């Protein structure tokens, strides 16, 4: 299955913290329907305890990680300059845009779906 979604760390971290809305949304995904960037993987793996890190690792292993490319890096730099985003957020946006994926996030401060049609806010807490 070709992926449709690029998952941001907010959704995965919410799931790991027991936020039911995140868990329910993730459970609806079919195998191969979503991917995570290496940036999301690194952010999620920053658990504070060994147990958190193990749970995070197991979760991250269930998603493919497409490579970052020069094209994505160039677009991320443009988006950072244009929008003032932090570089990890700019990379997420660039990867979603270049791959034709919906960026699934809860970060409405930076990613307003009205301004950015590549963004999907699956739930609010």
Enumerate the predicted regions with their spans.
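Short, well-structured N-terminal submotif of metal-dependent ribonuclease cores
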Residues: 1-36, 45-58, 125
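Short active-site oxyanion
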Residues: 32-33, 61-64, 97-102
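Acidic catalytic patch
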Residues: 42, 61-82
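Short glycine/serine/threonine/alanine-rich loop segments
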Residues: 81, 85, 101
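Generic structural signal for small/hydrophobic residues in well-ordered secondary structure
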Residues: 8-9, 44, 76, 96, ...
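Acidic, PIN/NYN-like endoribonuclease modules and their adjacent C-terminal/linker elements
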Residues: 2, 93-125
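Alpha-helix capping/helix-boundary segments
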Residues: 11-12, 40, 72, 91-92, ...
């Amino acid at each position: 299955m070709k992926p449709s979604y690029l998952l941001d760390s907010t959704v995965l971290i919410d799931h790991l913290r027991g936020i039911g809305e995140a868990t329910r949304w993730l459970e609806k995904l079919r195998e191969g329907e979503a991917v995570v960037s290496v940036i999301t993987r690194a952010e999620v793996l920053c658990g504070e305890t060994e147990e958190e890190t193990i749970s995070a690792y197991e979760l991250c292993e269930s998603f493919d990680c497409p490579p970052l490319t020069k094209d994505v890096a160039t677009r991320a730099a443009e988006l950072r300059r244009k929008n003032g985003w932090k570089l990890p957020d700019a990379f997420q946006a660039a990867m979603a845009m270049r791959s034709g994926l919906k960026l699934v996030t809860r970060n409405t401060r930076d990613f307003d779906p009205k301004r950015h049609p590549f963004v999907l806010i699956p739930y609010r807490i």
